[in-house]
Structure formats: structure tokens, C-alpha cells
């Protein structure tokens, strides 16, 4: 009886509940001062074209709090940190399930761990 109930539960559960959402950051470990940093976030388990989904980039300098950098919405609308707006560009390639962040004119104060997050 328990097996039957579990099977029925699986059959009636929407597929999005069973899917696993993952976001994986990739990019260089080090960049030199004045260079441009390009980071890629490859997502799975959801679509970048979904009207309720967006992806943000955030960073955390050593020993400091998280800092939000940029966000891209499903309709391609973009939002940037006011203090870094002139150095940041966020874009997405829905066909590759990727969100790319570029940050120009890197400086030692930009040393941090960079993360992407679904919001």
C-alpha cells in the first residue's frame, strides 16, 4: 500500500518539483590589474526564458560580506550595482543556458569569490 501511494504521488507531482536546479560558475582564477574578467554561469533545471526566473552575480571579498553585482531578467532587462555599473556587463545566451558577466579594469580590490544565483 505504501508503495502504491508513493507511486501515485510521483505521478501527480509536477515535473518542475522533481528537477534539480544547478548553476555552475566558470572563468579564470586570476586576472591581472587593468584586465577584463569574464565569468560564465551555466544553468540547468530551469529555463532562462522563464518569465519568473532571473540570474544575479554576487561576490564575496575575503573576510567581507556578500556584494550584489548585477541581475538579468528573463525579458533581458538588466540591473547593475550603482557603484560598479560603468565596469559591468551582464548578458545571457538562452540557447546555451548561460549568463555571462564581464568586469573591466580589474583591480586588487576586486579580489573575491564570484557566484551566480537564481533569483
From Swiss-Prot:
Domain of life: Eukaryota
Biological processes, Gene Ontology terms: immunoglobulin mediated immune response
Start and end residues of each stretch annotated as Complementarity-determining-2: 72-78
Main location per the UniProt record: secreted
Region (Framework-2): 55-71
Alphabetical list of Pfam families matching this protein: V-set
Signal peptide: 1-19
CC terms in the record's Gene Ontology section: extracellular region; immunoglobulin complex; plasma membrane
SMART domains: IGv
In-chain residues carrying the UniProt-annotated modification Pyrrolidone carboxylic acid: 20
Keywords: Adaptive immunity, Cell membrane, Disulfide bond, Immunity, Immunoglobulin, Immunoglobulin domain, Membrane, Pyrrolidone carboxylic acid, Secreted, Signal
Disulfide bridge map: 41-116
Annotated spans, Framework-3: 79-116
Record localization: Secreted; Cell membrane
TM annotation in the entry: none
UniProt-annotated stretches for the region Complementarity-determining-1: 45-54
Complementarity-determining-3 as annotated region, ranges: 117-119
Domain Ig-like, first and last residues per copy: 20-119
Full protein name: Immunoglobulin heavy variable 2-26
Annotated source species: Homo sapiens
Annotated gene: IGHV2-26
